[in-house]
């Protein structure tokens, strides 16, 4: 088992503290770029057989909701479908975000 040193600027896993700091800064910059790019990633869901469509971006901003006029009279169903649709949309967004973040962090792992 390889010992990792972290005192006095000595090596940590084969990299100096300066190299690790630069790597961390580079990773933070890349993560911020990806975070900013999420505003350009469009995500949508359709629930109730297409009666409700919700559109958002991966930065968690809802952009539009389309509701079939027939649902406007049945507020209970409308409410249930909106909740289901928003939850499904958020799950989709989180999956996209996790996959993109994993790609970034995987490239920076020292081992």
Curated annotation (Swiss-Prot):
<dbReference type="InterPro" id="IPR036894">
    <property type="entry name" value="YbaB-like_sf"/>
</dbReference>
<keyword id="KW-0963">Cytoplasm</keyword>
<dbReference type="GO" id="GO:0043590">
    <property type="term" value="C:bacterial nucleoid"/>
</dbReference>
<keyword id="KW-0238">DNA-binding</keyword>
<dbReference type="InterPro" id="IPR004401">
    <property type="entry name" value="YbaB/EbfC"/>
</dbReference>
<dbReference type="GO" id="GO:0003677">
    <property type="term" value="F:DNA binding"/>
</dbReference>
<comment type="similarity">
    <text>Belongs to the YbaB/EbfC family.</text>
</comment>
<dbReference type="Pfam" id="PF02575">
    <property type="entry name" value="YbaB_DNA_bd"/>
</dbReference>
<protein>
    <recommendedName>
        <fullName>Nucleoid-associated protein Tmel_0542</fullName>
    </recommendedName>
</protein>
<dbReference type="GO" id="GO:0005829">
    <property type="term" value="C:cytosol"/>
</dbReference>
<comment type="function">
    <text>Binds to DNA and alters its conformation. May be involved in regulation of gene expression, nucleoid organization and DNA protection.</text>
</comment>
<comment type="subunit">
    <text>Homodimer.</text>
</comment>
